[in-house]
Every structure is written in C-alpha cells, then in structure tokens.
Amino acid sequence: PFANGKGFDGCDLAPANTYPVYDGASDDLRTLVADLNACLKANGEKPIKNVKRGKMARLIAHYKSQFNDEPMAVDFSAAGAQAWYEKGRQFYWAKRGQLNFSCADCHVTNSGNSVRGDVLSAGLGHGVGFPVYRTKWSMSGKPWGTTHRRYGGCNKQVRASPFKAQGTEYKALEYYEAIMNTGVPLKVPSQRQ
C-alpha cells in the first residue's frame, strides 16, 4: 500500500492484455509503465525512474501475471491508433545500424536460426512474456528487464544507437508487436537466455 493507504487497485489501470492503450485525447499511447508511474504520482509516491529493469520490471511482472492466459486484445480501431501502428510497423521492418538489420531480419526471416549459440525467437509472441528474467542480465546482478530494455539491447547488437525507453519509437514498436500478437495469451514472467 501507498503512504495514503491506497494501492494500485485504486488506479485506472487497463487489463494487462490490452496494453499499450491508445488515448485519443492526447493522441499518445498509454503504456503500463506510464500508467503505473502515474498511479504512484497521483498517490503521493515517487515515480520509478528506471523504467527498464529492477523495481519497475518486477511491478509489471506482478500486475501482468494476474492476467496470465488472457489473449492479447489491443484496440487499434481509432484513426490515431492506426497511425501509431504504422509507426511501429515501419520501425519493425526498417533496417538500421552498422549491420543493417531490421527487427524482422532476426525475428521473421531468421527466426529459429542460431546466432552466437542462441536461437532467434519468432516475432509472434514477442512481448507476451515480458518482463523477463534473463540469464545474461543476471550476470550483472540486474536480471529483470522490460520490453524496452530488450529493444535497446537489440539496437545495440545491430550497432545502432538505442532510443529512449518509453520514447515514441519504442512505444510504437511495442504497440505494433502487441497488435500482431492479438489472440496470443499472456505468459508472465518468462525466462530468456
């Protein structure tokens, strides 16, 4: 509970399987991270600054786990929502970095193949297990990570500069992947190499 005696259950959080949520009034996406921080702030608590790992990742895991087995059902019927979907789609398929890879190069064209001993995951299902406990991250003592932490890591691996977590690019990508996973059930948390 918060210092005021209330908790997250008193906040306007959407079901986990419907995030990100398009907000027509602001023409922006509400991510679970942003909604959790807004709830903290509205109740006199400090927002969590590190939105890529640690406390935020564990909080997301707890909230999303309550919706395990619920199929992804993100609404993108509004015109503004479709524009966000298109931004995410363009990001997913655009080549970037010194290696000139897109998200699709790894997770569509080469899914199932091995890179440096790791099998590349298929794009279908990305996001439904996040946040994740990752073995590689545990070596540094910070094993939990959000989707945006992983996006940043992917960008670095193709030798592109990562974008800001919760920035426009990664929010659009998260939205695109969530819509592409319509019908795929949530399974949180998950473990990755």
PLM region descriptions:
Residues F2-R58, S65-D69, A94-Q193:
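Electron-transfer interface patches adjacent to heme c in soluble/periplasmic c-type cytochromes
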Residues V33, N37, I60, Q82-Y85, ...:
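Hydrophobic core segments within long, regular secondary-structure runs in both alpha-
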Residues F67-R96:
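Electrostatic cytochrome c docking/interface patches
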